[in-house]
């Protein structure tokens, strides 16, 4: 069951409106491709969740605030009384994880995921919900290689989604 649909970000809508009207700089073109790929990855995840629609409640593209902190949640699924927070990445290429951090990236998606999980848990507790929250980075693009990945990392690859929610 879908409770909130996904919409294009304001940034993506702006890029699409300008595309063809102006020539993007290299940096603008890179950012446009990044934002577009992210949205496409989120839509692909939505399609996968829709195939499980009878067992899943979906909330997409949420902006949450609690205790002066905010987070953007790509997808929140409720399955059998458990809440799954998914941060969706449509990355392509090779990446390495060492000691819980992505090598060579300035921002750490695992830290972002933990922060989002804390905010979701706080909001649920504040409104009287006592449910377990499981947070996962979902790498939706099959053209990704993750080196150094351990079972302790809260990471799902595309082929693991269906069995994970089993």
What residues fall within each predicted segment?
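Surface-exposed interaction regions that form or flank ligand-binding interfaces
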Residues: 1-71, 80-82, 102-166
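Active-site beta-strand-loop-beta-strand hairpin of nuclease catalytic cores
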Residues: 78-98
């Amino acid at each position: 069951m879908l409770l909130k649909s996904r919409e294009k970000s304001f940034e993506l809508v702006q890029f699409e409106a300008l595309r063809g009207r102006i020539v993007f700089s290299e940096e603008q073109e890179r950012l446009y491709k990044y934002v577009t790929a992210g949205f496409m990855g989120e839509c692909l995840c939505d399609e996968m969740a829709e195939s499980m629609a009878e067992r899943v409640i979906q909330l997409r593209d949420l902006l949450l605030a609690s205790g002066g902190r905010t987070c953007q949640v790509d997808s929140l699924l409720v399955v059998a009384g458990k809440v799954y927070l998914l941060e969706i990445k449509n990355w392509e290429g090779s990446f390495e994880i060492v000691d819980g951090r992505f090598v060579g990236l300035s921002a750490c998606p695992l830290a972002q995921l933990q922060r989002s999980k804390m905010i979701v848990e706080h909001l649920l507790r504040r409104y009287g919900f006592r449910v377990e929250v499981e947070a996962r980075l979902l790498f939706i693009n099959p053209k990704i290689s993750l080196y150094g990945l351990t079972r302790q990392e809260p990471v799902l690859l595309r082929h693991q989604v269906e069995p994970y929610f089993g």
